[in-house]
């Protein structure tokens, strides 16, 4: 349900900033997509071969359409990658990232067979939560917004109308009773903290109020003259540096699940009524244990809501709080978009089925909890959207995939093709070889690639075969690693980076070497047991796997098989069709395929560089431990917190140097605990402080 209140959104044009112009198939693909969307087609499919620059095509399409856009990705990694690339295209527009804010999530569950109740357990990522709030804030205040999301977009979120109603508009010259404003902030779940400025808090110093919104990296300073707002300024939360002077600002709630006192009162009455009805049903059926369990749990939750306005698992009462009818769809991110937004579904052959499958998986767990008295039936209305509810909420949709699924191809009036790569690279040559002696043949092919300094991907059907092959290749002196499902995301990224850097030569995997892997150094993809029909050897899986060799000038794919299956034939024919088109285009335009040079780098490298720079600074100016004023009796965390409370502009050079040392220690500690978002934020703070310090040193010379 979109907000009924008329919201004035800031209008600024999308403007692509890039040193490149559309090339290859991009110009005709962008023009055709624009024509189809503007003519009112609801479903448009872009069949984009691997490496043809689909992200850039989306950016130029957004610039032409000038409409808010939601891009849905199948996982967090691809969403982060896509958002980062779009940010380089749109430095002056809002490119937001909306994914689940859980680092770890164990849902509430009950296993009747063993009478085991598992309580909900989770670990929140504060930086990702800020980005979620930033997304909804941008959607409600401006039109030049692109949100990159996972299926989190279809999960329950607070009511947009209530979120807008609780928004606090502030304007210079406006009459405001200061204490009333503080009460409004507390009602909106902000916490007063006069010591340290953290997100979701505010502090008061005389006639000055400083608010640290959850959706901003910067803070807001409100200066009063009596009961009148004299000035509004956006400032850096650490240094206190003024970033901008504002005439008007909006302060949104500190949580998406905000509800006023009247709404909460109404919700509690509704929960009590449902509880009485449910208890009557359970007692009538002789389920006395379940009835007692439900009574104790729900009355405790109601008491918590009455006393503090919230309770553990309050999302299970969202239907009552939102005032929705039983069985109705929850509010979600889609409801925060204006009516004319454009949806882009990337890797649609994976993402569309994923959207359809979310509801049933969630519902089976909830039904068990309700049947055994752990939750009221209304808890089942705290859920993701059903697929038909999703389609009702979206308008025009562009599907992107190298292998579009049957759902999208049936709905679209033909596909738009993007096959020619800007680099002139062509699809890899596919060779089919018999399985007899396949390992010895594979070793010979690997050695040829290793001598050239290239990487190799090998995909097998089973975990056992992947492990055995890895051991066998290593015994024969080939540097090999094995990528499997038990390796966490960060380690997986590290392995791929090591392959690109040449620290090993062969990566063996099962179903992980497909969508989104960008490895220009790989010139050979070997597919073992290619003729074993099934999910891992379907035509779409094979085409996606073949695409991993499409970013190398010498790209080649070897399929080991004793017969050519229907899936293999489709994959080979489609690859050859694309290859013929690409080679004909290159010949006609005199294009010599250029190897793709993609920068190898990650967050750990940037953190290491920042740490090394601090060490050099400490050595040069002799700041840090052992110096006068260093207090060894407090922890690094306490010291860093003290540092943040200081106004940097008034700090002595030596104190500023010590603060940089402390923050660098904290950054390294965060990186060691794999808290990379925290470490990245600290890295940015440290860079700002070093700039300030170097200016101080220069001024004092």
From Swiss-Prot:
SMART domains: DEXDc (SM00487), HELICc (SM00490). A motif (Beta-hairpin) lies at residues 101-124. SUPFAM superfamilies: C-terminal UvrC-binding domain of UvrB (SSF46600), P-loop containing nucleoside triphosphate hydrolases (SSF52540). CDD domains: DEXHc_UvrB, SF2_C_UvrB. Residues 35-419 form the Helicase ATP-binding domain. Residues 438-604 form the Helicase C-terminal domain. Its main location: cytoplasm. Residues 657-692 form the UVR domain. GO terms for cellular component: cytoplasm; excinuclease repair complex. One of its GO terms (molecular function) is DNA binding. It is found in: Cytoplasm. ATP binds at residues 48-55. NCBIfam families: PRK05298.1 (NF003673), uvrb (TIGR00631). The beta-hairpin motif is involved in DNA binding. The UvrABC repair system catalyzes the recognition and processing of DNA lesions. A damage recognition complex composed of 2 UvrA and 2 UvrB subunits scans DNA for abnormalities. Upon binding of the UvrA(2)B(2) complex to a putative damaged site, the DNA wraps around one UvrB monomer. DNA wrap is dependent on ATP binding by UvrB and probably causes local melting of the DNA helix, facilitating insertion of UvrB beta-hairpin between the DNA strands. Then UvrB probes one DNA strand for the presence of a lesion. This is UvrABC system protein B. It comes from Cutibacterium acnes (strain DSM 16379 / KPA171202) (Propionibacterium acnes). The lineage of its organism: Bacteria, Bacillati, Actinomycetota, Actinomycetes, Propionibacteriales.
């Amino acid at each position: 349900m979109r907000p009924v209140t008329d919201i004035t959104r800031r209008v600024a044009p999308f403007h692509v900033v890039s040193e490149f112009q559309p090339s290859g198939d991009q110009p005709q693909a962008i023009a055709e997509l624009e024509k189809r969307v503007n003519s009112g087609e609801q479903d448009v499919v872009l069949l984009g071969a691997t490496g043809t620059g689909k992200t850039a095509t989306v950016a130029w399409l957004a610039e032409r359409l000038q409409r808010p856009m939601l891009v849905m990705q199948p996982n967090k990694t691809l969403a982060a990658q896509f958002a980062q690339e779009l940010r380089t295209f749109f430095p002056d527009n809002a490119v937001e990232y909306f994914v689940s804010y859980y680092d770890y999530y164990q849902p509430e569950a009950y296993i009747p067979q063993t009478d085991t109740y598992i309580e909900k357990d989770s670990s929140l990522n504060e930086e990702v939560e800020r980005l979620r709030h930033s997304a909804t804030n941008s959607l409600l205040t401006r039109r030049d917004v692109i949100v990159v999301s996972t299926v989190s977009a279809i999960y329950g979120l607070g009511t947009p109308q209530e979120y807008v109603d609780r928004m606090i508009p502030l304007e210079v010259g406006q009459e405001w009773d200061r204490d009333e404003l503080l009460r409004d902030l507390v009602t909106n779940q902000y916490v007063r903290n006069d010591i340290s400025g953290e997100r979701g808090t505010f502090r008061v110093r005389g006639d000055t109020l400083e608010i640290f919104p959850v959706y901003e990296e910067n803070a807001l300073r409100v200066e009063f003259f009596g009961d009148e707002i004299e000035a509004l300024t956006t400032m850096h939360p650490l240094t206190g540096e003024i970033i901008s002077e504002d005439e008007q600002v909006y302060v949104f709630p500190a949580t998406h699940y905000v509800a006023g006192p009247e709404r909460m009162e109404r919700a509690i009455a509704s929960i009590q009524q449902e509880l009485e009805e449910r208890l009557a049903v359970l007692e009538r059926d002789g389920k006395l244990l379940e009835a007692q369990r439900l009574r104790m749990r729900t009355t405790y939750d109601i008491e918590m809501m009455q006393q503090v306005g919230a309770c553990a698992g309050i999302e299970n009462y969202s239907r009552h709080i939102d005032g929705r009818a039983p069985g109705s769809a929850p509010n979600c991110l889609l409801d925060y978009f204006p009516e004319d937004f454009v949806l882009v579904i990337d890797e649609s052959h994976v993402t569309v089925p994923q959207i359809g499958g979310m509801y049933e998986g969630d519902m089976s767990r909830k039904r068990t909890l309700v049947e055994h008295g752990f939750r009221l039936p209304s808890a089942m209305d705290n859920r993701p959207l059903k697929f038909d509810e999703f389609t009702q909420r979206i308008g025009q949709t562009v599907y992107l995939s190298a292998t579009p699924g049957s759902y999208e191809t049936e709905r679209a009036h033909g596909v738009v093709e993007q096959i020619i790569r800007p680099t002139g690279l062509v699809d890899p040559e596919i060779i089919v070889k018999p399985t007899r002696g396949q390992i010895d043949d594979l070793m010979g092919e690997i050695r040829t690639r290793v001598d050239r300094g290239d990487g190799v991907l090998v995909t097998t059907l089973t975990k056992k075969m992947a492990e055995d092959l890895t051991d066998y290749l290593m015994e024969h002196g080939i540097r090999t690693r094995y990528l499997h499902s038990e390796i966490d995301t960060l380690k997986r990224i590290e392995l791929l980076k090591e392959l690109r850097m040449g620290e090993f030569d062969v990566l063996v995997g099962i179903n992980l070497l497909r969508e989104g892997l960008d490895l220009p150094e790989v010139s050979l993809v070997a597919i073992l047991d290619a003729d074993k029909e099934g999910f891992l050897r379907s035509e779409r899986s094979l085409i996606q796997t073949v695409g991993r060799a499409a970013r190398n000038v010498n790209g080649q794919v070897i399929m080991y098989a004793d017969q050519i299956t229907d899936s293999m034939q489709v994959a080979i024919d489609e690859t050859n069709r694309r290859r013929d088109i690409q080679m004909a285009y290159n010949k006609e335009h005199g294009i010599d395929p250029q190897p793709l040079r993609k920068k190898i780098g990650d967050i750990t490298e940037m953190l290491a560089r920042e740490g090394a720079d601090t060490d050099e600074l400490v050595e040069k100016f002799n700041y840090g431990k052992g110096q006068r004023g260093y207090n060894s009796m407090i922890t690094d965390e306490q010291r860093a917190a003290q540092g943040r409370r200081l106004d940097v502009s008034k700090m002595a050079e030596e104190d500023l140097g010590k603060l940089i040392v402390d923050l660098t220690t904290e950054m390294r500690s965060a990186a060691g605990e794999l808290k990379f978002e925290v470490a990245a934020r600290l890295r940015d703070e440290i860079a700002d402080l070093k700039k300030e310090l170097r200016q101080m040193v220069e001024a004092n010379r």
